[in-house]
Swiss-Prot record:
This is Elongation factor G 2. Keywords: Cytoplasm, Elongation factor, GTP-binding, Nucleotide-binding, Protein biosynthesis. The keyword GTP-binding applies. It is found in: Cytoplasm.
Length: 701
């Protein structure tokens, strides 16, 4: 079967934003204008197409990234038909993991900002994530009809707070209730969308006289930004020649794809103005799969050679599973991005991370929650497979004859835990099944059993994250459960360096056990995790026993040394030891490694680490003193203060998570409900002695 749309007319994009910037409404309009939904769904009514889980429709926030495919040929039908694969991502801080894994498989993004509140804390997080994966962006300043909307102020904030070179290609005509349309600064014409057909048609008009000067000034900035794309254009511009519309567009496209500039558009999705022009910008300025560097991975050979997979149907098949979702009708859906090659239904593929073969039973393309069956998937496509048995988020799927492992995604450690218990015996098994499925879907959600109390502990990225997990267990799996008080996920590490002996000997007639190791235990760099170095020379310990020592140390690290919390950032070097021809076994060396680590870590100045959160409080000036005083009482460190709009102040602080429980209620009562806050995980830092002592005593009592 030949390719329907050439790969240069593909756009894989995400729509990302802060929680209330109007992202889902923007996506709804995209579906409406591209002819995929005949009735516009409103978030206000709980009827939006992309928000397909019940919790999303109730809370009015998007939780899972629904993937959808649509076609667009331009507002004026000026292009060939382009295929746009869109992933709608959540904006709430507790779901940053969803955003992160979507950005990993996208080629470009539309970042939506609210015209009145501008750059908010979550926008910065999303922006940093997009920087991390080098995703080219176009900005859409939405809600231009809202009170206090100011397009140029938001552009200024993007430059200042996000450090981006932001170049407007639109200028708004009127704002707040007088918002009428936009000026296209490349064509230097006003666009007037027709209200009678919900903006499906439009007319070009002259620029209003009062905006002529401002539009010309902004156009000069835009042409200068385009001219910087190449020496030839710069020479032409400096010699006073006009750049053609075609030259400007190609230059802006090149600089956007290179992440040198970010183009800004504006409008109001709710009022059906502007989204149509954003779709044009996606086609004109965001990359096709072949315009971005080919994805890299490592081959399945001795040296783990680096290799690339270009966006080409002829290349061997390689794809990345970026999301697992449970569908009530078909079971598990594995969303994947095909980077190279072609795969057909019924084909066998290989998962190098799990070292297993999988078979593609059925392949579907999703439109929010409607499915279209596909026979094949080609380079550049985003689709979902049904019937894959053992695939988790971030796994590679590839051609069994050309094995490659694409780089995996990093997932943040959960910072908050709660105990859950089923209400009845009948719910016990159902709960285990439900938690297993939810953990497979979401890598930032972990489930484990507390060995002492036997309780099931679930951990996640924040209180809302865990609320929604408990809610989903009730609705999707009919499991009723009781929930305990939230607990903080503490960690431990060491500050000193020691050499230590670990010896496990059992010799009492018959076959005994003998394992003997010498280890150097020292701190590793922050964030570097656990590192095991084998420095055994001359066969002091046979090769086959060394992985067991590593395993024993690793298992002991999970149990901690101070208060039973997992140990982070440690480097262990195995440098000597001895063995017994008959009595040595893998088990004996595993126990010796574990004993050595427990003894050594206890001597290497162990300390307790607590999660610190980056907190941003937005408050009217009158309550500023109260807010700062309260954060100080919570062991917070005030990092800075900024001015918001209309007498609003923004306080930036780092505060230990343990001090932030119940903060929203306290903040509301202290400021008569007028202040709001957001927080996200920042890092693990050493807990003060008095705090550490209280936690250790509580764990040991």
């Amino acid at each position: 079967m030949a390719r329907k749309t050439p790969i240069n007319r593909y756009r894989n994009i995400g729509i990302v934003a802060h929680v209330d910037a109007g992202k889902t409404t923007t996506t709804e309009r995209v579906l409406f204008y591209t002819g995929l939904s005949h009735k516009i769904g409103e978030v206000h009514d709980g009827a939006a197409t992309m928000d397909w889980m019940e919790q999303e429709q109730e809370r009015g926030i998007t939780i899972t990234s629904a993937a959808t495919t649509c076609f667009w040929a331009g507002m004026d039908k000026q292009y060939d038909q382009h295929r746009i694969n869109i992933i709608d991502t959540p904006g709430h801080v507790d779901f940053t993991i969803e955003v992160e894994r979507s950005l990993r498989v996208l080629d470009g993004a539309v970042v939506v900002f609210c015209g009145s509140s501008g750059v908010e804390p979550q926008s910065e997080t999303v922006w940093r994530q997009a920087d991390k994966y080098h995703v080219p962006r176009v900005v859409f300043v939405n809600k231009m009809d809202r009170a206090g909307a100011d397009f140029e102020r938001v552009v200024g904030q993007i430059r200042k707070r996000l450090g981006a070179t932001c170049v407007p290609i639109h200028l708004n005509i009127g704002s707040e209730e007088n918002f009428r349309g936009v000026i296209d600064l490349i064509k230097m014409k006003a666009i007037n969308w027709n209200e009678s057909d919900q903006g499906m048609t439009f007319t070009y008009e002259g620029i209003p006289a009062e905006l002529q000067d401002r539009a010309e000034a902004l156009r000069t900035e835009l042409v200068e930004a385009a001219a910087e794309a190449s020496d030839e254009l710069m020479d032409k511009y400096l010699e006073g020649e006009e750049l053609t519309e075609e030259e400007i567009k190609l230059a802006l496209r090149q600089r956007t794809i290179n992440n040198e500039i970010v183009l800004a558009t504006c409008g109001s999705a709710f009022k059906n103005k502007g989204v149509q022009a954003v779709l044009d910008a996606v086609i004109e300025f965001l990359p096709a799969p072949a315009d971005v560097p080919a994805i890299t991975g490592v081959l399945d050979d001795k040296d783990e050679t680096e290799a690339t997979r270009p966006a080409d149907d002829e290349a061997p098949f390689a794809a990345l599973a970026f999301k697992i979702a449970t569908d009530p009708f078909v079971g598990t859906l594995t969303f994947f991005r095909c980077y190279s090659g072609v795969v057909n239904t019924g084909d066998s593929v290989y998962n190098p991370v799990k070292a297993k073969r999988e078979r593609f039973g059925r392949i579907v393309q999703m439109h929010a929650k409607d499915r279209e069956e596909l026979k094949e998937v080609r380079a550049g496509d985003i689709a979902a497979a049904i019937g894959l048995k053992d695939v988790t988020t971030g796994d590679t799927l590839c051609d069994p004859n050309h094995i490659i492992t694409l780089e995996r995604m990093d997932f943040p450690e959960p910072v908050i835990s709660i105990a859950v218990e089923p209400r009845s015996q009948a719910d016990q098994e159902k709960m285990a099944l439900a938690l297993g499925k939810l953990a497979a879907e979401d890598p930032s959600f972990k489930v484990n059993t507390d060995e002492e109390s036997g309780q099931t502990i679930i951990s996640g990225m924040g209180e809302l994250h865990l609320d929604i997990i408990v809610d989903r267990m009730r609705r999707e799996f009919s499991v009723e459960c009781n929930v305990g008080k939230p607990q903080v996920a503490y960690r431990e590490t060491i500050r000193g360096k020691v050499d230590v002996e670990g010896k496990f000997v059992r010799q009492s007639g018959g076959r005994g056990q003998f394992g003997h190791v010498w280890l150097t235990i020292e701190p590793n760099e922050e964030g570097a995790g656990y590192e095991f170095i084998n420095n055994i020379v001359g066969g002091a310990i046979p090769k086959e026993f060394i992985p067991s020592v590593d395993k024993g140390i690793h298992e002991q690290m999970q149990n901690g040394v101070l208060a039973g919390y997992p140990v982070l950032d440690v480097k262990v070097t195995l440098f000597d030891g001895s063995y017994h021809d008959v009595d040595s076994s893998e088990m004996a060396f595993k126990i010796a490694g574990s004993m050595g680590f427990r003894k050594g870590a206890a001597e290497a100045k162990p300390v307790l680490l607590e999660p610190t959160m980056k907190v941003e409080v937005t408050t009217p000036e009158d309550w500023m003193g109260d807010v700062v005083g309260d954060l100080n009482r919570r062991r917070g460190v005030i990092e800075g203060m900024e001015d918001g709009v209309a007498g609003i102040k923004i306080v930036l602080a780092k505060v230990p998570l343990s001090e932030m429980f119940g903060y929203s209620t306290d903040l509301r009562s202290a400021t008569q409900g007028r202040a709001s806050y957001s927080m996200e995980f920042f890092n693990y830092s050493e807990a003060p002695n008095n705090v550490a002592k209280a936690i250790i005593d509580a764990r040991q009592s």
